[in-house]
Amino acid sequence: MSNKERTEPQWVTPSSNQDVPPDYETIGTIFGYALQALSWILIIVTFPFSMCVCLKVIKEYERVVIFRIGRLVFGGARGPGMIFIIPCIDTYRKIDLRVVSYAVPPQEILSKDSVTVSVDAVVYFRTSDPIASVNNVDDAIYSTKLLAQTTLRNALGMKTLTEMLTEREAIAQLCETILDEGTEHWGVKVERVEVKDIRLPQQLTRAMAAEAEAAREARAKVVAAEGEQKASRALKEAADVIQANPVALQLRHLQALNSIAAEHNSTIVFPVPVEMFGAFMKKDQ
């Protein structure tokens, strides 16, 4: 053993003079202010030519969302009218607020009762919140179109063929409600959904046409049979009346003669009742 004292390990604690990770957010803010000051100096030096780049005209149906050094500019969407853009540090996006009409491509849909149909629809929508349409989704218009297709397929897939053909307005209202709820977070307002056409397979169309024709023929036969029944009943009642009243028979006889004479025939068959010859037959006997 050495006479030297054994030294204990020394632990080094971080001192207050050691480097601390910088606050990147603070540095970025300072750098942003500096860049903004330089941009203003550049605008002033190049005035009035810089106004050609800084001033933008926004139409009545447009709004502009401005980002300054990556952050949304206070005040929300700008427009309509003239706005001021600082070069180098400002970026902006124009948003059209007009209603967009989108014709949904024909969708092959399997109904609840396993019938494949082709459905066409039209969706009318517009941007209601420009900031949400920029911040919350990459392309609000394209995303709304895709969602419209899937919503139409899902809504019609829960219906039978008969419900599809007879409840178009209810189906359109259901699609509008679902689509409007799905696009609300994107700043899009769905105005209306219309189901244009529901096309059936040719074989099913022919079968339905044959069924409808058979149903029409059956109804026609029923109506004809009911008419014959009513006519027979009327004839029976007339015969009972004539049998009870001989004068009515004579009147009917004269009416028939009048009808024959009105036809201007050269030959007229005059029916004579057998009872008229009864007296002559008795006299001969």
Swiss-Prot record:
Gene3D superfamilies: 6.10.250.2090, Band 7 domain. Keywords: Cell junction, Cell membrane, Gap junction, Membrane, Transmembrane, Transmembrane helix. This is Protein unc-1. InterPro entries: Band-7_stomatin-like, Band_7, Band_7/SPFH_dom_sf, Band_7/stomatin-like_CS, Stomatin_HflK_fam. It is a multi-pass membrane protein. Pfam families: Band_7 (PF01145). The chain crosses the membrane at residues 27-47, 69-89. Coiled coil: none annotated. The gene is unc-1. Its main location: membrane. Signal peptide: none annotated. GO terms for biological process: positive regulation of cell communication by electrical coupling; response to xenobiotic stimulus. It is found in: Cell membrane; Cell junction, Gap junction. One of its GO terms (cellular component) is gap junction. GO terms for molecular function: ion channel regulator activity. The keyword Transmembrane applies. Belongs to the band 7/mec-2 family.
